Swiss-Prot record:
It is found in: Cytoplasm. InterPro entries: Rossmann-like_a/b/a_fold (IPR014729), TilS/TtcA_N (IPR011063), tRNA_Ile_lys_synt (IPR012094), tRNA_Ile_lys_synt_N (IPR012795). ATP binds at residues 21-26. One of its GO terms (molecular function) is tRNA(Ile)-lysidine synthase activity. The gene is tilS. Pfam families: ATP_bind_3 (PF01171). GO terms for cellular component: cytoplasm. It comes from Helicobacter pylori (strain ATCC 700392 / 26695) (Campylobacter pylori). One of its GO terms (biological process) is tRNA modification. This is tRNA(Ile)-lysidine synthase. Ligates lysine onto the cytidine present at position 34 of the AUA codon-specific tRNA(Ile) that contains the anticodon CAU, in an ATP-dependent manner. Cytidine is converted to lysidine, thus changing the amino acid specificity of the tRNA from methionine to isoleucine. Transmembrane segments: none annotated. NCBIfam families: lysidine_TilS_N. It comes from the Bacteria.
Length: 336
């Protein structure tokens, strides 16, 4: 469990929130964190799909009270279709609301080595690139917080051994083959983990190290709600990474469209991606279209500010109107 302890370092500073389900993984992580004197609270989503849902909620509340922790419960609306994707969105929206309201610095999740292998195999079968194959990271920076997955190199069998005297609940949906992940688990991942777990751990460590070398640190700046960085051969990787930090995951077809459009398009009617000769920009699309005055348009044009960014900048300009607003933005690009 040395890898586990290494990944706890960030949790020693700031407030922490554990995503808790009452299942094997999050229960083990709960007690491992308690054993390491990590301070945290817990958050649970009730999807109203489990027979034991009320017992799970009561158990979570009792556990939190016993260990002097806050316990947040969210009762999700009924999910009619695409359960896994909708459940994930509900879960992360709930976590991010709590993080914002209570100033949590870290979101702790109980993903383990088996989860990572299942994801890897699923993406491999789709024809994914390195960034998507390795999208599960032990430490993942988001805009206002970081996701920490201390168990990412820990096999599920290790957790089963640790949990032999602990109370936890089995989720019936984990055995349902109508979910693709469960098919990959049953048909491929389980047997690979049973026979080759040590080699799989080492391979993921090598791949993580090589990913860091392939995608070196890129300086990212932000001004007036626009995130930007210098264009390089890793530009698509950076766009994917930044959008993920903002809570949006690009599909393969969207990535292809970004390349075809030379980094100048809208994504999901929500994000603007734009570029000039040297930079790539990412911004939230303004909620409403504003009519820009001619002098603002002219100044933006003379400064070679890309067209898609002008409405974003104008919306920000209205909040803090100064005569050198656009000039300072242009200067920030030159200073990058």
């Amino acid at each position: 469990m040395q890898d586990f302890k290494t990944h706890l370092e960030p949790l020693k500073e700031g407030k922490n929130l554990l995503g808790f389900s009452g299942g094997l993984d999050s229960t083990c992580l709960f007690f491992l964190l308690v054993g390491e004197n990590i301070v945290f609270d817990i958050a649970l989503v009730d999807y109203n799909t489990q027979k034991q849902r009320l017992e799970i909620i009561q158990h979570a509340q009792k556990l939190a009270k016993t260990h002097h922790k806050k316990c947040y419960i969210h009762h999700a609306p009924k999910i009619a279709h695409n359960f896994e994707m909708q459940a994930r969105k509900i879960r992360y929206d709930f976590f991010e609301t709590l993080i914002k309201e209570h100033s949590y610095k870290h979101l702790i999740l109980a993903h383990h080595l088996n989860d990572r292998l299942e994801w890897f195999l699923m993406q491999l079968s789709k024809g994914a690139g390195l960034n998507t194959l390795l999208s599960f990271q032990a430490y993942e920076k988001r805009e206002s917080y970081a996701i920490v997955r201390p168990l990412l190199y820990t096999p599920k069998d290790t957790l089963k051994t640790l949990a032999k005297d602990l109370k936890f609940f089995e989720d019936d949906s984990n055995s349902s083959l109508k979910f693709k992940r469960n098919c990959f688990r049953k048909n491929y991942a389980n047997s690979l983990m049973q026979d080759y777990s040590k080699g799989i751990i080492q391979s993921f460590k090598f791949l993580d190290q090589e990913k860091e070398r392939l995608y070196p640190l890129t300086i990212v700046s932000q001004m007036h709600g626009i995130t930007f960085f210098k264009y390089s051969q890793n530009a698509l990787f950076m766009v994917d990474k930044i959008l993920k930090q903002k809570g949006y995951v690009l599909s393969f077809s969207q990535k292809e469209e970004i390349k075809r459009s030379f980094f100048s398009l809208e994504i999901a009617q929500k994000f603007i991606i734009e570029s000039d000769k040297e930079h790539v920009f990412i911004a939230l699309k303004p909620p409403k279209t504003l009519s820009m005055p001619k002098d603002f348009k002219d100044r933006a044009r003379r400064l070679d500010i890309p067209k898609r960014l002008r409405p974003v900048l104008y919306a920000e300009f209205l909040k803090q109107p100064t005569h050198d607003f656009l000039t300072r933005f242009k200067q920030s690009l030159m200073d990058l």
